[in-house]
Amino acid sequence: MSFFNEDGKVWMNGRLVPWKDANIHIASHVIHYGSSLFEGFRAYETPRGTVVFRLDGHIKRLYNSCKMYRMDVPYTMEEFTRAVLETVRANAFRSCYIRPIIYRGYNTLGVDPFP
């Protein structure tokens, strides 16, 4: 399956949305200053179904990065973990690369997002 599966679903702002509707505002801090963090990991097809490799460790590392970057995440690690699994299921992925991104939105603008 192509990375650009326009018929797929993306988890964004707490819910699954159609891929085509996963957009961010032009005034978002991330667009102007690149203020985002990401992780990259894989899910694999196994005889017992799809398994996300070391999911808890990846989510913990992402949240730790957000803490160091002073970026609040509006979801608990458990909610975020469920979101990853829900997205994999919603797209019927058996094997895939997962790239969660957390970014600063459009509530602040300027080099220092902490006025």
Question: Where in the sequence are the language-model features?
Answer:
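Conserved alpha/beta cores of soluble small-molecule-handling proteins
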Residues: 1-115
